[in-house]
Amino acid sequence: MARIRWLTRTSRIVALCSAANFINSADRVIMPIAIVPMTDIFQWSLHAQGWILSAFAFGYFTSQILGSFWASKLGAKNVLICSVLLWSIATFVTPFLAHSLTALVICRIVLGFAEGLGLPTIFHLFAHSIPVEERSRAFSYLLASGSVGQTVASVLCPHLTWDACFYWFGSFGFIWVSLWYFVYPEDAFSSEDTIPLHMPKVISRSIRWADFILSKPLWAIYVAHFAMNWSSYIIMQWLPTYLARYLGGNAHSLSLTSVPYIVNSIFGVISGHVADGLLLKNWSVLNVRRLMTSVGLVGPALFLAIFCVVDHLPFAVVLVSISMGLSACNSAGHLSNHVDVAPNYAGTTFAISNTIATIPGILCGPVTASLVTAFDGKWMTVFLGATFVNLMGAFIYFTNSVATQVL
């Protein structure tokens, strides 16, 4: 069958990668929603729920650097196909393994491992295929697609049986693999000339692992990413449970968990266009990255601080939605900063950053369960802790970030 050619090469890459991120993000949202009815069936304790939710992050943590390495050695196309196929299989078989807590946790680890390969591979692809003047938009569309995936899953899953959620979204991944084969531009890495004119050519120099670890500008990015993910993981993992158990939500109310992701996707696209617009108005890249990161970390911190004292469910959803929306500004902030400071190694720096930023995903499950249990079912310490982490991340990024090439 003839390959599809009705989009430009860059557009096809962005569209395909965004579709992969849609499925990636949708699959990871299913369990936080499904765990509410599953707990009624399997009678899991709050701590057991915490470990089920955090098991994903254990796998995700281990595969970040591997994703970047394999993409450079084996080809981004091959790595991305394999990762989507593996995480789709893990999603599809989850209902069959749910009767065994151990088997379910292992399946969640495999899911996390496969999904962890995705974004570093995509960053590797973007770093070699997207011109500088289009990067903010490309990253914004990429991350917005993840929010759309989370939105779709959050809307549909409360109205499906818990096992059907896994079957449907697992099947989407199988469809994507076929689309990738027919739409992917084969010439994406065919020659050095495919690297955009406005992107630095690969520099032949010796890079040590210490260069990725000892750079203050890179640590500014790593810390900002960690801070962003701390609050994001709490919301992703625990918002359905919080609305259902603490604010008295029902199946209809759980559909409201889609609203934060809708707002996040809209803000993500808007922030990308705003950032590119500021660059066209001669703002420095550094000032744009700092502005977007400050809005993306300080804004959510303030709204989470208010969210934790509200007991009116619709108002609580409004507050957490604004928080998630402002968080999307990070896509044009520190997340885009990788290709500014390390254009030839953006896949590797993102892999390291995402590995560090996965630690909150490992901790948020058991730590949240322990805090809620210790404070007699109160969640205030959970959200105030996230507020503090966000504010510290914003301060460290603002005072240490650069936009010049360091690697």
Predicted segment positions?
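Extracytoplasmic
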Residues: R12-L46, I235-P240, C364
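Residue-level signature of mid-helix packing/kink "hotspots" within the transmembrane helices
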Residues: V29, A57-I65, G116, Q150-T151, ...
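Extracytoplasmic gate region of multi-pass secondary transporters
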Residues: M31-P32, S215-S271, N330-S331, G361-G365
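Conserved MFS/SLC helix-loop-helix module at the cytosolic interface between two early adjacent transmembrane helices
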Residues: T62-T102
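Structural signature of the two symmetry-related core transmembrane helices
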Residues: N78-V93, L286-A305
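Cytoplasmic helix-loop-helix junction between adjacent transmembrane helices
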Residues: C107-G146
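Glycine-rich segments within core transmembrane alpha-helices of 12-TM secondary carriers
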Residues: S136-P158, V263-G268, S353-G365
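Helix-loop-helix hairpin linking two adjacent transmembrane segments in secondary transporters
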Residues: L142-A188
